[in-house]
């Protein structure tokens, strides 16, 4: 059964929301701008897809930065970390493919999810 679940994810903004989308394939999470790119949730990523579909190498964040990289503008850092953990729990698995972020090019390049 395909369902939508809304979750409050404050931190970047007071009214931030994430949407869990249950599909036949599994549970995707539409994150909006919390986080705005997958590297925020997965700071050890070493590749990213750019517009047009090319995969490019990127430098992973230093491990001592912690489990997440926060957006540049955060109204509440504690709420932000709580929301990142909530977002991770909403997905099928802790893998970037399950997170549709607001500014990731692979989300623009892909035509169908689930």
Identify the function of each model-found stretch:
Residues 1-24:
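Core dinuclear metal-dependent hydrolase active-site scaffold
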